[in-house]
């Protein structure tokens, strides 16, 4: 008996003028997600999804490439203006913002939404190399 073929749902192109670019920059990777104003995903990319492996994922260049890929995909769907919210301590924060601007998106605001603990859990110990 042959396996039943399931119909794949086609991605619907949304026409969105303005949205929010969420840049999550960790020590190991950079994720760029572009949403509409309500928070529904329009486009996303990450350094790992572009083929960077290991320590190369955490570089500013990888963050730049991820931001360019997400911006291109969002601009194909009609995105022109974007607010940027940056989260995390990683190396690719500024590089990703510059790449969004260079790709042709107009940045209207930049917010830093890095969560800061009010003395929560104990942080990881310092590395000794």
From Swiss-Prot:
Q: Which Pfam families match?
A: Ribosomal_S11
The UniProt keyword set, sorted, is: Ribonucleoprotein, Ribosomal protein, RNA-binding, rRNA-binding
Superkingdom of the organism of origin: Bacteria
Database matches in InterPro entries: Ribosomal_uS11 (IPR001971), Ribosomal_uS11_bac-type (IPR019981), Ribosomal_uS11_CS (IPR018102), Ribosomal_uS11_sf (IPR036967)
Its BP terms in the Gene Ontology are: translation
Note the Gene3D superfamilies from the entry: Ribosomal protein S11
Q: Name one GO cellular component term.
A: ribosome
Signal peptide region: none
Q: Which GO terms describe its molecular function?
A: rRNA binding; structural constituent of ribosome
Q: Which family does it belong to?
A: Belongs to the universal ribosomal protein uS11 family.
Q: How does it assemble?
A: Part of the 30S ribosomal subunit. Interacts with proteins S7 and S18. Binds to IF-3.
Alphabetical list of HAMAP family matching this protein? Ribosomal_uS11
Name the job this protein performs: Located on the platform of the 30S subunit, it bridges several disparate RNA helices of the 16S rRNA. Forms part of the Shine-Dalgarno cleft in the 70S ribosome.
Protein name per its UniProtKB record = Small ribosomal subunit protein uS11
Encoded by which gene? rpsK
